[in-house]
Amino acid sequence: MPELPEVENVKNTLNRLVGGKTIKEVNVLWSNIIKHPELDEFKIRLSGQTIQHVERRGKFLKIFLDDDVLVSHLRMEGKYALNQKEEPIDKHTHVLFEFTDGSELRYRDVRKFGTMHLYPIGEEEQQPPLSKLGYEPFSAELTPAFLKKMFSKTGRSVKAVLLDQSLIAGLGNIYVDEILFASGIHPEQKASGLSLHRLKRLQENMVSILKESVEKGGSTIRSYVNSEGRSGNFQLELFVYGKKGEPCKKCGREIARIVVAGRGTHFCSSCQK
């Protein structure tokens, strides 16, 4: 699933590709993707509106138009690409936004898990799914002291807490494993037991790793590409994620894989305590 760095790169490429384009017509080939409003209203409201800009919130895209905001979640395999109307339509393309200049923004999703919600500007943050999201990882409010207070309310592992989108929005399996490795924290460690010193390292590594990944285009583990069709490069920098059985780059011990919070989890038993 695309995480914060990947969605940030999709956001940046969409701004370059479709900012300022006016929607002529919307064609939906798989209606289950449209969660709000009803399909006919979704298509009618979007027609005639111009894309102003695109933002990111957690793992969601917020496509701002004249009057509405299209909230899009890519889930496992969702992708956007700009095509010309006359180009063949891939069988996994499910939503097409035709623009007045003859180009089309196409949403492709092999798994069909992606979602789209349309709300009037200003209402999107008060409605699901955005209303359920926690703090952005880059938020100045996420100080070590604030994290200590947040984590003290739970008996869960630090990995489970970092994956909880209602607390911190945008992290997923890849970056939680990498952040915990960089911080020397075992993924099964109780979040409530972490000291301020360890939380400071965690917060600093969270910010630095996410920023570096954004700069390097995100991580292409399986099929991720941005909206210009480019793969990411941060997968080349990973220390533990997907490295089961390989020697740790820091100490040489074999990287282990366990299941934490229902997710496959990679870590070094020597470097992480």
Where would I find each of the regions flagged by the language model?
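Structured catalytic/nucleic-acid-binding cores of DNA maintenance enzymes
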Residues: M1-K273
